């Protein structure tokens, strides 16, 4: 049964590739997540050779920036006012992306290091809360379940990817065990705190710019 679920996951990673003409490129980050899962044993060996927060942050920010670049590609053919980005100008958007994504990558990294979160749990919690945050709540208010699923997959993938890369090392650490409800509550706190921090950093980055 576990093998069948794993095969299903790996095959599902092909879906974003096959739907690019209709759904765009942004959710290709899910394909990257699935590919990482497929070769996770090798990735864990490389990661554990020199683990640390700096390496985790590097992987997390590469994941986040890859997602943002894909989002820019999907929005280039739209008028600037209609682009679902941090800023309609691609270069400015990439500048602001550092402020937005860093708190989510950092806080989830600290939470996963201390508590027994799996990449799947980060995927679900981070993806579900992303539905509320995307476009300042406009996606959630659209009441479109397909849009919800799309956002869940995109947000969940970029947040879970560094956790999956580090999971081989994390499992060897003495992390505090939490039950499902406590994990959910703490995960929501991580998301809320990261969202507030991202908002503050975005304001600061815009002032500096």
Predicted regions and their residues:
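Aromatic-rich, lipid-facing transmembrane alpha helices and their immediate juxtamembrane interface loops
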Residues: 1-209
């Amino acid at each position: 049964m576990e093998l069948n679920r794993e095969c299903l996951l790996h095959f599902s990673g092909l879906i974003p590739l096959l739907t690019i003409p209709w759904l765009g490129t942004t959710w290709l980050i899910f394909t990257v997540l699935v590919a990482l899962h497929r070769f996770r044993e090798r990735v864990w060996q490389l990661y554990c050779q020199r683990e640390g927060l700096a390496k985790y942050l590097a992987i997390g920010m590469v994941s986040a920036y890859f997602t943002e670049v894909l989002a820019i590609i999907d929005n280039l053919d739209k008028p600037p006012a209609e682009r679902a980005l941090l800023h309609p100008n691609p270069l400015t958007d990439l500048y602001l992306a550092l402020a937005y994504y860093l708190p989510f990558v950092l806080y989830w990294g600290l939470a996963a290091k201390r508590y027994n979160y799996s990449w799947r749990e980060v995927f679900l919690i981070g993806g579900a809360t992303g539905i509320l945050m995307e476009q300042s709540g406009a996606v959630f208010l659209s009441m479109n379940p397909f849009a919800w699923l799309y956002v869940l997959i995109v947000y969940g993938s970029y947040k879970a990817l560094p956790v999956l890369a580090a999971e081989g090392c994390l499992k060897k650490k003495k992390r505090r065990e939490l039950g499902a409800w406590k994990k959910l509550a703490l995960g929501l706190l991580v998301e809320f705190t990261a969202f507030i921090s991202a908002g503050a950093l975005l304001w600061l980055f815009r002032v500096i710019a």
